[in-house]
Amino acid sequence: MPNHYDVIVVGVGSMGAAACYHLAKRGAKVLGIDSQQVPNTNSSYNGNTRVIRLTYQEHPDYVPLLRDAYLLWREIEQESGTKLFHKTGVLYAGFPDGEAISGVHLASETHNLPCSTLTHSELAKQFPQFTLPEGMVGALEPEGGYLLSERAVETYAQAAQRLGAALLTSEQVIDWSSNAQGVSIRTSDGSHVAAKLILCAGAWSGGLLRLPAVPLIVTRQVLGWVQPSRPELFQRGDFPVWNIDPHGDRGMSGIYYGFPMSNDPAEGNGLKLARHHPSTPMAPDEITDETFAADEEEILLPLRRYMPDALGQVQTIKVCKYTNSTDGHFIVDRHPESDRVHFACGFSGHGFKFASVMGNVLSELALDGKTQHPIGFLGLSRFANS
């Protein structure tokens, strides 16, 4: 007879590791299952660091969740004794009518968040590291910064185990079923049963969820580290996390973003930057860690255009995965097939910062059938007419 658990969590990545921790903290008997080791490079959180920010340009409804996320990141730092968050401020730059600048102002005004506005000349004076087109303006959020993503997943997984959670790695979930007695999970090595099931399998969510009306689009994204020609200009403490919306600047597209440099090897070697953009849909198993010449050009292009003092030798390129919903917003809800099953997916390249609070959300949904956190806008109902 297989062991019977209170909750099984499929996918021990960003959201799943945090869910295992919050479930175990409440005394639940938890099993986390992942097809890879934890942490691993074949993931959405690969690449050392992720941005965290409060003035959320994507939609102001995320801000209450972010406030809770900040508190819970501090909580796991204190409980584990592990540094995960660096507060550097986040600088946004773009044209006034672009989505980034207008979205940042909407979020800050809606939720009364600290955020200063910079004219083009003020931006050039305060941050001479950038050479931006005439007409671009800035917004500076003091509370933002970045998280150590792989270290955070490992920290949550280890904390969950200390609290009694069991983790099975390198074990692939093949299928699941649910009835009045509970849920059953069939894996590459056997089967497991539980009262409740949480599905948060990242790029592999589509096959497990069995929801054809809610397509998930998986894309390959690259992250690069460059050794700047003038590294002294880009050190943590003097240089913020940055985000440039090039909308309106000919030949540039997507969102370019990056991080300050530090001496911590957990953050990579050099100045990290990347491009947030739709990219080409792929099957998750088609995306490997192989890199190409075009990847290097994608990393260097924004430096040539906006940060000439950061140009230099590309040190490292890494690959991560986006799992995009059709509207770019997360999907967190009860599965329509069963009250015993909840899921989180479609984090669309901007989800990691929410891992701390999403773990709590998922634990409450599984154990209580509801959550105190405001996630209504992330539900399945918005796809009812799609």
Model-predicted segments: where are they?
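Predominantly flavin-linked oxidoreductase catalytic cores and closely associated redox partners
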Residues: 147-232
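Active-site substrate-recognition segment that forms the wall
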Residues: 21-25, 83-85, 191-192, 196, ...
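Flavin (FAD/FMN) cofactor-binding and adjacent substrate-gating region
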Residues: 75, 95-169, 175-181
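Flavin (FAD/FMN) cofactor-binding core of flavoprotein oxidoreductases
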Residues: 121-125, 146, 281, 293-356, ...
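Dinucleotide-binding Rossmann-like beta1-alpha1 core, especially the glycine-rich loop
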Residues: 49-126, 255
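N-terminal Rossmann-fold NAD(P) dinucleotide-binding loop
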Residues: 16-17
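Beta1/beta-strand and adjacent pyrophosphate-binding region of the FAD-binding site
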Residues: 2-13
